[in-house]
Amino acid sequence: MNRVILSLKNIDKTYGKEQVLHNASFDIEQGEICGLIGENGAGKTTLMRILLGLIQSDKGEIKSVSQHKIGSIIESPALYPNLTGRQHLQYYKTRFSLKTDIIKMLELVRLPQTSWDRKVKNYSLGMKQRLSIAIALLDNPELIILDEPVNGLDPQGISDLRKMILNLRDQLGVTFLISSHILSELEFITDKYIIMKKGKILNVMSSKELANDLSEKLFLKTSANQILKTFLKEEGIVHFEQDDYLVVPEKEKLMLLLEYSVASNLVIQDIYIKKERFEDYYLSNII
């Protein structure tokens, strides 16, 4: 097991009469890319603000690397529109007396060299995200916290961001905690999922555990679905309809359904097995 660099135990937070975090607990190990998953209003941003020391929890314990070893982008990137990308890094390097090579940072986040001396007001959102992450890297953090980083990005921007995060983890050993409600965009890079609902941590699971938890469903389309549907009901087999298909969550029922279809002279027009997507799992089990 890798070194635990962040540990939360029993974190509570209340605003007025509304409790927005309830007994939140989880650990993050060095080098992990962790997805903090939940609907808007689940408490993700509040939790991240507590981790960064921007607000205080009402109770609970946090053990982590020192604050200067945590970089972050919370909500939209805070940049100065009339400064260039290079000037941003030079400003923060001077302000905090850092010795980091700013050219190396710009190259690490793959910000195009032609944009280094261009004013940020002329940057795309994806370029602004890259620059913000370069700023977060200036103090050589062990952990970077990103709040909804894919918001507003086009598909190419999302793909580029994923590649950059993987590259930074692999090259520098940086650990990431990334919040999102766009689940499919984290599915390709996440090592661990922390699933939240209404301020509570519902589950903490590795990507391997989640993959094992995703079911494989049988999709079947015949010349007379209604007859087959009646048979499924009589046999007590769980099923539902999707478009023109009957969907059976138990793929093991395949032979039984084939035998019945042949015996009943039903023409099988299409049949396949499909693994449940994370998005579907989330919608059916969490929301």
Features from the language model and the residues they span:
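The feature captures the beta-strand-to-loop junction immediately N-terminal to the Walker
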Residues: 37-39
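Short, charged/small-residue-rich alpha-helical element at the C-terminal edge
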Residues: 216-285
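Catalytic Walker B motif of ABC-type/P-loop ATPase nucleotide-binding domains
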Residues: 144-148
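ABC transporter nucleotide-binding domain
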Residues: 166-246
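Helix-to-loop junction immediately C-terminal to a conserved catalytic motif
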Residues: 52
